[in-house]
Amino acid sequence: MVTGALAVLLVLTAVWAVKLIQVARSVNANAAYWSQPRGEPGGLLYVALGDSAAQGIGASEPDKGYVGLIAQRLRDGTGRAVQVVNLSTSGARIGDVLDTQLPALGSLRQTPDIVTVAIGGNDIRAYDRATFGAATDQLTAALPRGTYVADAPYFMHGRWQRDAAQAADLLRASAVEHGLRPVPLHDALKAQGWQAMLTQFAADWFHPNDRGHRVWADAFWSRISAADDRFS
């Protein structure tokens, strides 16, 4: 019986290791996928800013991340073509959005119909309230009015979660102050409970899997569909 249990454990470990490698490899693969506009030109333009979550890391395919899911819901809700320009980068922090992604957004020839931002998760690792608050205010002041801004992700427990909860408050308040549309991502993820760790995360236990990305998309879509009847 012990030998059988050990064999099962070894198999499970091997499967986990393979999936972990797949997550790591998806960073370059997803960046290549999103390096060009995706979808159909001539209709709605959706621009995404953010970090690896916006890149779809953890999902089985790049377009099964929350950005791809939002794009599909825009198609379904409007009956129109949707083109996605995904300017996010894995590992990005708020400073990277300010330095690189916002200038790229400003250089687009077509004015976006919808812009989403999910950033701040990587800033939690070296969180300082004053620094984060200043960066958040700079970001929200520079974003187009009406941009959908997610607050910080939920980190389950410990210091990171305490910092993330505070960061979420700062993001929400700053978004409202600058005429943006805050998305309550933190509360949406928290509502999934501890079971989400087993069912909604990729093998690295950091990025959302397909199911987790659907939760992210749901949080955004609830806000989008309520705020703009063009998309519902």
Language-model features, listed with the residues they occupy:
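N-terminal secretory targeting modules
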Residues: 1-48, 59-60, 75-76, 110-111, ...
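Conserved SGNH/GDSL esterase-like catalytic core that processes O-acyl groups on lipids
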Residues: 22-27, 45-47, 55-134
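Alpha-helix initiation/capping motif
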Residues: 39, 59, 63, 77, ...
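Cofactor-binding loop segments of dinucleotide-utilizing enzymes, especially the Rossmann-like FAD-
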Residues: 51, 89, 152
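Ser/Thr-glycine-rich phosphate-binding loops at phosphate-binding pockets of nucleotides
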Residues: 52-54, 209
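Hydrophobic residues within alpha-helices
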Residues: 53, 66-74, 139, 171, ...
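Short, acidic Gly/Pro/Ser/Thr-rich loop/turn segments
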Residues: 54-55, 190
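Alpha-helical cap/lid subdomain in secreted, periplasmic
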Residues: 100-232
